[in-house]
Regions:
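Juxta-kinase regulatory segment immediately upstream of eukaryotic protein kinase catalytic domains
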Residues: 1-19
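Residues that form generic nucleotide/phosphate-binding pockets
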Residues: 7, 108, 135-139, 154-164
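Short intrinsically disordered, low-complexity coil segments enriched in acidic
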Residues: 2-4, 76, 140-141, 167-170
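Protein kinase catalytic-loop region centered on the HRD/HxD motif
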Residues: 115, 163-169
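ATP-binding pocket architecture of kinase catalytic cores
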Residues: 21-142, 146-150
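A generic alpha-helix signature
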Residues: 1-3, 149-156
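Short Pro/Gly-enriched beta-strand edge/turn motifs at strand-loop
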Residues: 12-18, 58, 154-164
């Protein structure tokens, strides 16, 4: 099995010899900035992580829908464990940035959840951040995590947020 850097550098989508540069971020994948023929791309290499509810085919399907409604950059190339998208020069928003930009961010999220859902094609899995919270809480509980005493309180907060969000149209 190839290492992620080697995998990223030998993809058939490149028209020239490329030298991927590691990009920080990605909890379950390796990210690289790749320049090919004067264009920059982001290459993500990572296998499915079922324990974290990360299934790459689902990410790619949802990504294509997001691309179709103008929310994300264009997907250039995919394989089961690889995603190459156009690079957007910018910065990752931190909590303070999100707070400041919330009035601009929320309409984009709403747009994707309305128009993006109609753009989905093929099989997809549902995603609920609240389900993820419950899943992780059970994993931490079963592992006798140091966070175990906090889990009930955290799940109560998550349930309050889920109630505030209300039913999600799919």
């Amino acid at each position: 099995m190839m290492e992620p850097l080697e995998r990223a550098s030998t993809l058939p989508c490149w028209s020239t010899t490329v030298t991927p540069v590691p990009l920080s971020g990605g909890l379950s994948n390796h990210n690289f900035v790749v320049e090919d023929n004067g264009q920059k791309y982001v290459c993500r290499v990572g296998a499915d992580q079922p324990i974290h509810n990360v299934l790459r085919f689902n990410e790619q399907s949802v990504g294509r829908a997001a691309e179709a409604v103008g929310v994300t950059p264009r997907q250039i190339y995919t394989e089961p464990d690889v995603l190459v998208i156009e690079f957007i020069d910018g910065k990752t928003l931190g909590p303070k940035d999100v707070s400041i930009e919330l009035d601009r961010i929320l309409p984009r999220i709403k747009h994707f959840h309305e128009a993006g859902m109609r753009a989905l094609r093929g099989p997809i899995l549902g995603f609920s951040v609240f389900h993820i919270h419950r899943h992780y809480a059970k994993l931490l509980h079963d592992a006798n995590s140091r966070m175990r005493p906090e889990l009930e309180r955290l799940i109560e907060i998550s349930e309050e947020l889920e109630t505030a969000v209300g039913p999600v149209k799919v």
